[in-house]
Amino acid sequence: MHIGQHIKEVMQQQGATATQLAKDICCARTHIHRIFLKDNIDIALLERISTALNHDFFRDLSDEFRAKV
């Protein structure tokens, strides 16, 4: 799973914007766009994004990992 792309997809499905997500996690909008390009992410940052979008990205990653094992 490309986590940055997954975050972007979930955000768009919810009708949220990069600007709103940036406000919710207290960072610059440009940083959000850089996150979308990453295939890995800091756990603390993912926790903040999960809270802001009310989505359990950790479960998504875990489910994908289990499917591979």
Locate each region found by the language model:
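Recognition helix of helix-turn-helix/homeodomain-like DNA-binding domains
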Residues: 26-41
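A short, Lys/Arg-rich alpha-helix, primarily the initiator
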Residues: 1-20
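Residues within the helices of the helix-turn-helix
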Residues: 8, 19, 23, 33, ...
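Short, charged recognition helix plus adjacent turn
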Residues: 9, 14-15, 34, 59-69
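DNA major-groove recognition helix of helix-turn-helix/homeodomain DNA-binding modules
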Residues: 44-60
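Alpha-helical residues within the helix-turn-helix
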Residues: 12, 23, 51
